[in-house]
């Protein structure tokens, strides 16, 4: 763990191959703890972790809460409905309140892009010993989801020893609303870092052509890419072409709440063209796993029958793997906290 240099986890674009290896190794260990009878480690005993979710969440917030408790941390959950935001307090003042209370790690989800990054910059400038963990910001990033998806796939391809090598030269297809998906962006960084070839598929309104260059250059303000050679990214408009020879398929929810008018004609047409079903999976020419980060819109991006077919979909595995993955991140951020 001596190679871990991050005081915050904001975006997977900054992760080196060693960072991915560290997280996958720790996640494997913590998964055994999560499944054991004791289910707890004293690693973060006495540390305060605050979950500040300014957007609705079920899986991610609960997963972070359980992860923190598995590490014996004290946990404080923020609720918008019962907060002083209703009295006119700004989100920044709410967050600063938790910092003043001595929170060691703030897990933050916000509808606006870069809120976690701006907060990380604030605590660094003011020499505050608090780490920021991005639990999803706007369209930008959802690093813990990208990492748990990476672990889920690595475990599927190599159950005995999941690692970054488990993804090397694998063909992963991501289908759906790429434009509005922070999950897709985080998966692009993670999968290509580990040598996977990623094919994106969706209508032009939800998958602009510029996504083909998404991982070619670091984000604004980042001087270099810590990955020497990434896997390739392709765009296919035809689902049949995209699924050909795929080793795994991820389908994404249509984020209607983020869409402008007329971005889609109708949901029935979308399902016919891009819905993942048992029939469309035959284009892969072999049995492949299907992932979905949730929440699922049955009969829109994935068939009801496929959602309930646990011999093919890894949806429950993704939820299960979320806890040890987030344990790994919290543990790494909590390692160097001063008493």
UniProtKB/Swiss-Prot annotation:
Primary enzyme class: transferase
EC number(s) per entry: 2.1.3.2
UniProt GO molecular function: amino acid binding; aspartate carbamoyltransferase activity
Record carries keyword DNA-binding: no
Any Gene Ontology CC annotation: cytosol
Reaction(s) catalysed by this chain's protein: carbamoyl phosphate + L-aspartate = N-carbamoyl-L-aspartate + phosphate + H(+)
Family matches, as PANTHER family: ASPARTATE CARBAMOYLTRANSFERASE (PTHR45753:SF6), ORNITHINE CARBAMOYLTRANSFERASE, MITOCHONDRIAL (PTHR45753)
Protein's UniProt name: Aspartate carbamoyltransferase catalytic subunit
Native organism: Prochlorococcus marinus (strain NATL2A)
Gene: pyrB
């Amino acid at each position: 763990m001596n190679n871990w240099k991050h005081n915050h986890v904001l975006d997977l674009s900054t992760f080196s191959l060693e960072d991915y290896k560290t997280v996958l190794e720790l996640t494997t260990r913590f998964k055994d703890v999560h499944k054991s009878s004791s289910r707890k480690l004293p690693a973060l005993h006495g540390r305060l972790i605050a979950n500040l979710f300014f957007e609705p969440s079920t899986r991610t917030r609960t997963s972070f809460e359980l992860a923190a408790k598995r590490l014996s941390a004290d946990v404080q959950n923020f609720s918008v409905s019962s907060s002083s935001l209703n009295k006119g307090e700004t989100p920044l003042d709410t967050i600063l309140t938790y910092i003043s209370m001595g929170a060691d790690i703030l897990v933050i989800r916000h509808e606006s892009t870069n809120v976690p990054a701006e907060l990380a910059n604030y605590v660094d400038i003011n020499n505050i010993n608090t780490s920021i963990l991005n639990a999803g910001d706007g369209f930008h990033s959802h690093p813990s989801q990208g990492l748990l998806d990476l672990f889920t796939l690595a475990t599927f391809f190599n159950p005995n020893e999941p690692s970054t090598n488990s993804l090397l030269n694998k063909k992963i297809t991501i289908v759906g609303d790429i434009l509005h998906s922070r999950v897709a962006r985080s998966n692009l960084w993670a999968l290509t870092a580990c040598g996977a070839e990623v094919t994106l598929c969706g209508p032009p309104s939800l998958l602009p052509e510029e996504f083909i260059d998404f991982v070619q250059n670091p984000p604004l303000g980042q001087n270099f890419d810590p990955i020497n050679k990434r896997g390739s990214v392709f765009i296919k408009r035809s689902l049949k072409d995209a699924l050909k020879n795929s080793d795994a398929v991820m389908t994404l929810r249509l984020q209607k709440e983020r869409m402008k008018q007329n971005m889609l004609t109708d949901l029935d047409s979308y399902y016919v063209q891009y819905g993942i079903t048992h029939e469309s999976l035959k284009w892969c020419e072999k049995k492949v796993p299907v992932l979905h980060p949730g929440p699922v819109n049955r009969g829109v991006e994935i068939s009801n029958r496929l959602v309930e077919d646990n011999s093919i979909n890894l949806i429950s595995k993704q939820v299960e793997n979320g806890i040890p993955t987030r344990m790994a991140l919290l543990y790494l951020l909590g390692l160097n906290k001063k008493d």
